[in-house]
């Protein structure tokens, strides 16, 4: 019995880069696609939002002097590159998918239509959301929160390379304190870097829980959905 039926997974673009630091690492892509295939086979309805940092990092120096709005549009396009790569990886594993973008790209993706996205999920397709919210000044964390609320997801899973939320960066501080559970309010008060404040506020106002967990540990995603206490739960 699944604890969560419909979830949205948020991955950073950097997660796809792996140790390379930029671009798309084929092994990381395959690993994440396999994790999603496993939870899909359990009967979960899965939506996905991916950042674009792995693609955008290569042009970030040039973008530093650009108009913010133009730079943000470049970032949105970077998320679509990752989304197409992920769609291909999933479909090679026999997982049916649909790609929806917040900016019209009719030759390669559907426009985001809420009711259609929900129908795809009900039919067992993994829905990948690209191009963020379609608006500048909003991060892909905020896009993930917004889409999760719109599709009536029961949970956002933020996949990272650490085991959850700590009081400081565990990769820099070996004495960092791990939080198995923490409230939205404490995340905001302690300025913990779970998601950006707009995303956290959206989740808090709509009582949407977040789990932050290590996506690089095989099987974590499936165990979480089956009821194990994995990572950090951010709750009301």
From Swiss-Prot:
Its EC number is 2.7.4.22. Residues 18-23 are annotated as: Involved in allosteric activation by GTP. It is an enzyme of class 2 (transferase). It holds the Pfam family AA_kinase. InterPro entries: AceGlu_kinase-like_sf (IPR036393), Asp/Glu/Uridylate_kinase (IPR001048), Uridylate_kinase (IPR011817), Uridylate_kinase_bac (IPR015963). UMP binds at residues 52, 72, 133-140. It is found in: Cytoplasm. Allosterically activated by GTP. Inhibited by UTP. It comes from the Bacteria. The keyword Phosphoprotein does not apply. One of its GO terms (cellular component) is cytoplasm. Its main location: cytoplasm. Belongs to the UMP kinase family. Homohexamer. Catalyzes the reversible phosphorylation of UMP to UDP. This is Uridylate kinase.
